[in-house]
């Protein structure tokens, strides 16, 4: 029988529900259980694919092409699993599916209501996420906080699950903030008490409290919360601020969180062996070197817009025993005149993805600086496309070269819209999304990075591709197309082999990086950056 764990939040948002859920998932996986995890987002968008990065942060793409919440990145990195489209559910997605069924007459003339139709659809998504992965345990995080009007149908569905599958198969974990008032010199439990009262008013009695705090929590405070919130004292778990996120699973295990969960759900499984994870954390906290990477982006005011990029850089830094020092460079501010000032101290330059005209000229200048000064450079998605544009302009003499996306009237459309995208009008869910194969060119930098594999599978999110009309011109000038689709039609990786490292990929390699298994192309880039720093000392 599948076990269901539901993680809710109270008092304030952004208190780390996703990290708690992911950490618990890692502990249960290390007990030998097959775990999957999903996020409920109560907003009305179908998915975050068309949302501004300033509103939502990055869009995380799964193997099967779902555009999802960035928390799924945390889930995959912590638990080391690949999730699917059932792992992110929004209000908009549920309502659109229910309304589509109503239009088809599938409800046989019934009045369509929140209960039972919306709640039934939500419960079906929970169960589908478990069955499609054949999981022993599914952890479902509900976005937002208890008391938000948008969350009510989701919480009602969670309440009903207890009756549907049995109380011994369901566990409710409530995460809250425990504020510390310096003036009073004490922690305040009232916000948590009121949050639990609100949750209980909706018919959900939490079985565990996870309290987010900056300071150590005395047992007396835990006992008080246990008494007023009607949970066992040992089930009041402290989630204190840490230096590195990957410490959190170990901290939770030290408080027997996973054992309490297993006892409640009647799971008779061995203790979690966290030896390898602990060794990884110890290494992360004792890195001997540093390397400086300039990240040139258009959304740098909100680092969450590049969350997976940053995490992938860190993972590859761990593999090189190096901490990554990031210089956040706003592409809008970068010009040919100030490129040396902004980029001159960098050991490596990364140009990540994006959409639209703004900031593209600055990114092109960053790529040009990397090429002309032989600074290791990695381009991702739009960064790959602009790598081609930069080469066309400044090496091939095509001064007005551009992407069709950025200038439909350009005489040199180096990057063109994909043929199957030409007549598409909807913006959401219509990109080339998900896992696709990339055939590697033997002897190339890309092939070396991937241990000379012939084909790798990587996740994509784009609508435009390199225009093959110009391929011969590029190759004649020494530009290497080191990764292509199996039919040779789509360019996936480009490089200049004579440089220290000058490689750009159309796909998003960062989405498959893990702390204990860094993505290979990122690792090759960071290795080159570390070497570049050593050479310049």
Curated annotation (Swiss-Prot):
One of its GO terms (cellular component) is cytosol. Allosterically activated by GTP, when glutamine is the substrate; GTP has no effect on the reaction when ammonia is the substrate. The allosteric effector GTP functions by stabilizing the protein conformation that binds the tetrahedral intermediate(s) formed during glutamine hydrolysis. Inhibited by the product CTP, via allosteric rather than competitive inhibition. L-glutamine binds at residues 54, 354, 382-385, 405, 463. One of its GO terms (molecular function) is glutaminase activity. It comes from the Bacteria. SUPFAM superfamilies: Class I glutamine amidotransferase-like, P-loop containing nucleoside triphosphate hydrolases. GO terms for biological process: 'de novo' CTP biosynthetic process; pyrimidine nucleobase biosynthetic process. The keyword DNA repair does not apply. CDD domains: CTPS_N, GATase1_CTP_Synthase. Residues 1-267 are annotated as: Amidoligase domain. Keywords: ATP-binding, Glutamine amidotransferase, Ligase, Magnesium, Metal-binding, Nucleotide-binding, Pyrimidine biosynthesis. UTP binds at residues 13, 188-193, 224. Coiled coil: none annotated. ATP binds at residues 14-19, 71, 240-242. The active site is at 381 (nucleophile), 508, 510. It catalyses: UTP + L-glutamine + ATP + H2O = CTP + L-glutamate + ADP + phosphate + 2 H(+); L-glutamine + H2O = L-glutamate + NH4(+); UTP + NH4(+) + ATP = CTP + ADP + phosphate + 2 H(+). Pfam families: CTP_synth_N (PF06418), GATase (PF00117). Residues 292-535 form the Glutamine amidotransferase type-1 domain. Mg(2+) binds at residues 71, 141. Pathway: Pyrimidine metabolism; CTP biosynthesis via de novo pathway; CTP from UDP: step 2/2. PROSITE patterns: GATASE_TYPE_1. CTPSs have evolved a hybrid strategy for distinguishing between UTP and CTP. The overlapping regions of the product feedback inhibitory and substrate sites recognize a common feature in both compounds, the triphosphate moiety. To differentiate isosteric substrate and product pyrimidine rings, an additional pocket far from the expected kinase/ligase catalytic site, specifically recognizes the cytosine and ribose portions of the product inhibitor. This is CTP synthase. It comes from Streptococcus equi subsp. zooepidemicus (strain H70).
